[in-house]
Design a protein with these regions (language model features):
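Pre-recognition alpha-helix immediately N-terminal to the DNA-recognition helix
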Residues: 15-17
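Base-recognition residues in the alpha-helical recognition helix of bacterial helix-turn-helix
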Residues: 19, 43-47, 62
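Beta-hairpin "wing" of winged helix-turn-helix
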Residues: 50-60, 67
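Helix-turn-helix DNA-binding motif, specifically the short coil turn and the N-cap/start of the second
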Residues: 27, 38-41
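A short acidic, leucine-rich amphipathic alpha-helix
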Residues: 31-32
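Short helix-to-turn junction characteristic of helix-turn-helix DNA-binding domains
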Residues: 9, 21-24
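Conserved segment of winged-helix/HTH DNA-binding domains
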Residues: 1-2, 64-82
């Protein structure tokens, strides 16, 4: 888990996505508006973050809402500081 988490955190765009999700849950479209990139590019970053367990998603009708998985973030920080 830690290896995937650190790999996911190595990209500045993904770190910024996590910062935004720390403020509030968002859709891929809302996140894409914060960057100069397409929704598919943001979705790729979100998939990487999901695979690392740093982000969770939940479908609400037509939308998928992404959230920061604070438990995994705390575990990752604990492992790093450990």
């Amino acid at each position: 888990m830690a290896g995937e988490g650190f790999k996911a955190l190595s990209d500045p765009t993904r770190r910024r996505i996590l910062e935004l999700l720390r403020e509030r849950d968002m859709t891929a479209g809302e996140l894409a508006e914060q960057f100069n990139m397409s929704k598919p590019s943001i979705s790729h970053h979100l998939t990487t973050l999901k695979t690392a367990g740093l982000v969770t998603d939940e479908r609400h009708g037509q939308n998928i809402i992404y959230s920061l998985n604070t438990t995994v973030m705390q575990d990752l920080i604990g492992w790093f500081m450990g």
